[in-house]
């Protein structure tokens, strides 16, 4: 395990350097990270290194117990750091494409997709959570949301970036210019993740110059600085989008139930059959409540984040970015909802 851990540590280091080489490399990473937005930054980087096309990853136990899905034979796990295990330990994720349904029925994997019917509700929720959004189209609203979210939260991360610019291209700059670069790149990176995850064409909204600043983050510490901030803030916004879509879907289901019940009642009344009450009782659809939602505390996450993921003579520390979210996409939320249902 020690040898494997060192290999993954080196992979993490090399991948971090690679994604900061140029704007295209950074955009490639962001395109992958937005699909597994509930993962920590260090996990997103290792997922990108091993399975850049991964859509929704989870541990084998989660696939088996929560989704009744089984990992395909000979599938190779995605190694990531395990902060909850002993020092210098790894855990393994498998993508949904590595799994298949069990014999006794599987739970749907909740991977949301943006649709035109969700857009208005999404924009209203983002405006409510992150400040007024003046735009009337989704892409512009996402850009505004990214800017607002970064403005509100980046200072928590910047205070730590200032202490780790040694040997980077940021080292000779004063605090003001470092902050300008950091804020600009973070806002563009968060916006890219939101737009990409919502299925819009990023080429229509970004060019190379929007990410030219990434080359200044050319040390492990500064790569962590921009990566962690981008990952945390984008996750916060994408969670809001996900919940908004769920709310619309549940409202549509409730509306369909109501319509079906009214139609059945009218049909029964017309037939004037005395057994209709028993029939309706048997066929009544029980309405379900919504999923509860807990917004991440961005300040706490910034203070206890993967700044502990440092490079030293021995490699990466066993400590990793603090988070209670081990599952990306919408898998983690489905797990918690299932647990509440069993309680």
Feature-to-residue mapping (PLM):
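N-terminal accessory/interface modules of nucleic-acid-binding and processing proteins
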Residues: 1-287, 291-298, 307, 336-343
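Long, low-complexity intrinsically disordered regions
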Residues: 290-335
């Amino acid at each position: 395990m020690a040898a494997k851990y060192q290999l993954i540590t080196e992979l993490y280091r090399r991948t971090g350097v690679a994604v900061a080489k140029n704007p295209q490399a950074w955009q490639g990473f962001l395109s992958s990270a937005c699909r597994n937005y509930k993962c920590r930054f260090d996990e997103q980087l290792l997922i990108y290194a091993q399975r850049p096309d991964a859509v929704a990853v989870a541990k084998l136990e989660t696939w088996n117990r929560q989704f009744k899905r089984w990992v395909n034979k000979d599938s190779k796990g995605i190694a990531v750091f395990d902060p909850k295990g002993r020092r210098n330990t790894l855990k393994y994720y498998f993508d949904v494409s590595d799994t298949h349904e069990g014999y006794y029925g599987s739970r749907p994997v909740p991977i949301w997709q943006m649709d035109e019917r969700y857009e208005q509700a999404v924009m209203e929720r983002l405006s409510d959570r992150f400040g007024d959004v003046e735009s009337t189209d989704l892409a512009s609203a996402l850009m505004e949301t990214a800017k607002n979210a970064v403005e509100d939260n980046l200072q928590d991360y910047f205070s730590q970036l200032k202490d780790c610019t040694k040997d980077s291209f940021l080292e000779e700059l004063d605090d003001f210019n470092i902050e300008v670069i950091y804020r600009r790149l973070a806002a563009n990176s968060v916006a890219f993740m939101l737009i990409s995850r919502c299925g819009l064409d990023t080429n229509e909204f970004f060019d190379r110059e929007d990410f030219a600043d990434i080359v200044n983050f050319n040390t492990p510490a500064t790569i962590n600085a921009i990566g962690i901030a981008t990952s945390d803030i984008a996750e916060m916004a994408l969670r809001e989008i996900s919940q908004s879509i769920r709310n619309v879907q549940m409202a549509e289901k409730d509306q369909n139930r109501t319509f079906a019940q009214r139609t059945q009642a009218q049909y029964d009344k017309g037939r004037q059959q005395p057994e209709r009450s028993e029939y309706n009782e048997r066929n009544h659809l029980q309405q379900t409540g919504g999923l509860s939602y807990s917004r991440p505390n961005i300040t706490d996450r910034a203070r206890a984040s993967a700044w502990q993921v440092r490079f030293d003579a021995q490699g990466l520390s066993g400590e990793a970015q603090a988070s209670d979210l081990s599952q990306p996409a919408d898998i983690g939320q489905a797990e918690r909802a299932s647990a509440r249902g069993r309680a």
